[in-house]
Amino acid sequence: MQHCGYCQGGELLAKFGIKICDLKVSQLILFKEQSHPGRVIVAYKDHVSELVDISDEERNLFFEDVATAAKAIHVAFHPDKVNYGAYGDGGCHLHFHLVPKYKDEFEWATVFQMNPNLVTLSDEQYAEMIEKIKAHL
């Protein structure tokens, strides 16, 4: 799709994320706003809006990708909990936000903000975070 950052990549994706790698049926993206260290997005490989738009097999593989990403986040960053968000009314591409939460830290026991615009990293810090995640995939 023409205006979809997940589909087009490049500058559209760079506004909010950095591609880490491809998984079985999705791409793993580091969310640039890192108020929750280790926050990522798992975006389905094709431009579909809903889970019901893909086959049972593809849906199962998509959730395997979500679980793979969650395991990597748990090992790399040791959150107390990972929150999962699937919204998409602003951009209809099937994706999940995986948001590590840390007890007694930012937004613990509350719903996470989509983009609090509080924490951005240097290019070197993003690269380190990406390598840390990749090491545990």
State each model region's role.
Residues M1-L137:
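HIT superfamily nucleotide-processing domains
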